[in-house]
């Protein structure tokens, strides 16, 4: 069974979803979709399906669509194939003209599953959170820099005066962390990237940490609470002297990578790398 997740805010998404349904049903593959789309697509409503029977998820949208569906349906762990109807698309990297050849590859087993690490975090007496890309501690409505003390396995690292701090996974290294000056990590690497956001001190650079460690972030400034957000979707507040704890999650994000997939080609295309300068 395949779970199909169109993003109705993308104009062609539902039309393409209907075409995908026809393609898969003609090959005797059962399909489910969220209840609001199931009737329109004439497939099984997700609320009536045992999620353990779902073999694959297919997302139609961009990377944001993938992140939202992971947070909305945390109990569905089937590998995910992302069809790109958005802009950059590092996670959703199947182009429109490659949809049906890619589905054929999926059906015939011409793929592998990347188990990408996730980060989980918690604050005392507050619900825990998880993220595929990153957890961000941000100054929120505070109009000035905030002070964040960072500890690694309880050992003091540094106090950063900045707009905030990004705790990124390798998947997230091409997202917010990259925009803030962080390095690119290949997606199956296991590591954290700590990337300060607009630090006051130029020498405060991003740092890559091994995944087995735990990270503690203490909010030192006597200002309004700051915001802790996971993948830009869910968030909660962190008050002065509260400590946010982050570590590798026991859960992974399983992404379908077709045999034809070339991560470095994706990097070149999405980041506009042109190779050697021609003079």
Curated annotation (Swiss-Prot):
GO MF terms held by the record: ATP binding; metal ion binding; NAD binding; NAD+ kinase activity
Entry coiled-coil feature ranges: none
Name of protein: NAD kinase
Domain of life: Bacteria
Cellular component per GO, a single term: cytoplasm
Residues annotated as catalytic: 63
GO biological process: NAD metabolic process; NADP biosynthetic process
Gene: nadK
Transmembrane segments: none
Catalysed reaction equations from the record: NAD(+) + ATP = ADP + NADP(+) + H(+)
The protein's role, per its UniProt record: Involved in the regulation of the intracellular balance of NAD and NADP, and is a key enzyme in the biosynthesis of NADP. Catalyzes specifically the phosphorylation on 2'-hydroxyl of the adenosine moiety of NAD to yield NADP.
Subcellular location: Cytoplasm
Metal-binding keyword on record: no
């Amino acid at each position: 069974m395949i779970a199909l997740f169109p993003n109705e805010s993308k104009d062609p998404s539902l039309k393409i979803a209907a075409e995908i349904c026809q393609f898969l049903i003609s090959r005797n593959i059962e399909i489910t979709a969220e209840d609001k789309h199931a009737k329109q697509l004439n497939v099984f409503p997700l609320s009536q399906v045992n999620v353990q029977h779902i073999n694959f998820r297919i997302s139609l949208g961009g990377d944001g669509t993938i992140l939202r569906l992971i947070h909305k349906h945390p109990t569905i762990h089937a590998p995910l194939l992302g069809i790109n109807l958005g802009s950059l698309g590092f996670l959703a990297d199947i182009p429109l003209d490659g949809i049906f050849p890619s589905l054929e590859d999926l059906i015939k087993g011409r793929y592998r599953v990347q188990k990408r690490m996730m980060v989980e975090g918690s604050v005392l007496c507050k619900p825990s959170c998880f993220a595929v890309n990153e957890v961000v501690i941000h100054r929120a409505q505070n109009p000035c820099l905030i002070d964040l003390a960072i500890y690694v396995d309880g050992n003091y690292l540094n106090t950063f005066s900045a707009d905030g701090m990004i705790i990124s996974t390798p998947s997230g290294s091409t997202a917010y962390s990259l925009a803030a000056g962080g390095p690119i990590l290949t997606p199956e690497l296991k590591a954290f990237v700590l990337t300060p956001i607009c630090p006051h001190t130029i020498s405060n650079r991003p740092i890559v940490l091994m995944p087995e460690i735990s990270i503690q972030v203490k909010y030192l400034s006597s200002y309004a609470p700051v915001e802790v957000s996971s993948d830009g979707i869910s968030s909660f507040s962190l008050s002065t002297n509260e400590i946010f704890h982050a570590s590798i999650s026991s859960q992974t994000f399983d992404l379908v990578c077709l045999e034809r997939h070339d991560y470095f080609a994706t990097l070149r295309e999405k980041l506009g790398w042109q190779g050697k300068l021609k003079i």
